[in-house]
Amino acid sequence: MKILSCLLLCTITVLEGNVMNRHNKRFAGFNVAGIGGTAGCVVVDNKLFANGFFLRELTAEEQREFAQYVEESNKYKEELKVSLEERRKGWQIARQSEKGAKILSTITEKNLPKPPKKPSFCTAADTTQYYFDGCMVQNNKIFVGQSYVRDLTADEAKELKSFDVKMTAYQKYLSSSIQQQMNSLFGDKTNLLNLFTNTHLESTSQASEATTIPTTTQTPVEAPETPSFCVPIY
């Protein structure tokens, strides 16, 4: 069990190494069901913040939109809590039942509730952060730590947009590569589930033995070159 876990962690670490070594990453978020923090958009006394940075005061229309979002968000959290509890109980029953495979299939087919739509005043342009060596860019503004430096020029904004497109393609390639490595190590999703829940179902085992994992080749996607909006001194 410990060996398999280590193999999985090593696989992910190696495949993600290129991104980490280049010292750049992209982050975007709008927290609905989490425990809080400054990630994504935050509203305090009708003041809008994005990832900890103050943006502006909400308009009267945006305040009404925000009130509706809060109501829908609270409803979503309650529905999610109920749904997760149902799944937890289902997993317990599946582990003790001879029909565990069928029960697990029923659980996974039932969709979790969908979170409410984000308010119009909280967009990807507001919350997406680009971390480079020495600085961060958000909403076309350069920050060093928490200090605002300046706005990007028109040419720099175009360069950042091009970087975003290339980084998105690279992240998709990386994610696909990780999934292929996981499949080659553990087989299909059901087998991986059994490894970590100690659920050993005969029908699943027989099906996995008869399954051959196809090998696919992907055209490698290189990590994009980092924009030089700031230059750190080592």
UniProtKB/Swiss-Prot annotation:
GO MF annotation terms? aspartic-type endopeptidase inhibitor activity
A cellular component term (GO) from this record? extracellular region
Please state the protein's primary subcellular location. secreted
Alphabetically sorted, this entry's keywords are:
Aspartic protease inhibitor, Disulfide bond, Protease inhibitor, Secreted, Signal
Q: Which residues form the signal peptide?
A: 1-17
List, as start-end ranges, the regions of compositional bias called Low complexity.
Answer: 211-220
Output the superkingdom of the source species. Answer: Eukaryota
**Record's subcellular location:** Secreted
Region (Disordered) location: 204-234
UniProt cross-references to CDD domains, sorted A to Z: API3
Disulfide cysteine pairs (residue numbers): 135-230
Query: One Pfam match, by short name?
Result: Pepsin-I3
Q: Which InterPro entries match?
A: Pepsin-I3, Pepsin-I3_sf, Protease_Inhibitor_I33
Physiological role: Aspartyl protease inhibitor.
Q: Which family does it belong to?
A: Belongs to the protease inhibitor I33 family.
Q: What's this protein's name?
A: Filarial antigen Av33
* Organism, scientific name: Acanthocheilonema viteae
